[in-house]
């Protein structure tokens, strides 16, 4: 949506804004069902010499905060991690919008990162773990450009907070695909 998290939260009283790095809204329906609502993201950056408090990065390039909002699905799709996570559904028209080849990758069992892998992994090193988790869970292969930088850039994971790493590692093993996750982790 092009609505900000704060606007979504005002519309749905049964919601809460979560995340510091990437704000999203969890809307609770029927007691337990959670719908995750995200605002379109933008690739725009602060002008040279200007401070942009909505996008902050470390010296390594890791995004510490990225709440620069966009206005279009196309722009937002370029900020997603993998092509299969950049598919958009219009529930009224019952149409899927795909700007990055995600349908092809889904049909062919491929996990492919969007954009330059080195840049994208530097922005958020957890993307490396997410790639491995999706591969283990879905039985998909990592594209060469997605897998090749993982060993080389794995030290970037040391910059991720302990709490966030704990959360991501737990996800590797609670999806019912723990053995596959273990095998793929050993590979990398």
Identify the residue ranges that each predicted region occupies:
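Catalytic cores of the polymerase beta-like nucleotidyltransferase superfamily
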Residues: 1-188
């Amino acid at each position: 949506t092009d609505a900000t998290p704060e606007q979504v939260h005002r519309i749905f009283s049964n919601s809460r804004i979560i995340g510091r790095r990437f704000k999203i809204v969890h809307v609770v329906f029927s007691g337990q069902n959670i719908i995750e609502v995200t605002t379109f993201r933008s690739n725009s950056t602060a002008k040279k010499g200007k401070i942009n408090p909505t996008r902050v990065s470390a010296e390594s390039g890791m995004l510490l905060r990225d709440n620069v909002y966009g206005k279009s699905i196309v722009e937002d799709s370029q900020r997603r991690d993998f092509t299969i996570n950049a598919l958009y559904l219009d529930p009224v028209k019952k149409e899927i919008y795909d700007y990055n080849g995600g349908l092809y990758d889904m049909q062919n069992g491929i996990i492919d990162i969007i954009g330059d892998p080195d840049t994208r992994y530097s922005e958020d090193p957890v993307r490396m773990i997410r790639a491995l988790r999706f591969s283990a869970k879905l039985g998909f292969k990592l594209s060469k450009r997605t897998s090749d930088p993982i060993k080389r850039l794995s030290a970037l994971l040391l910059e991720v907070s302990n709490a966030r790493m704990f959360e991501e590692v737990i996800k590797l093993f609670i999806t019912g695909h723990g053995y596959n996750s273990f095998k793929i982790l050993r590979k990398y």
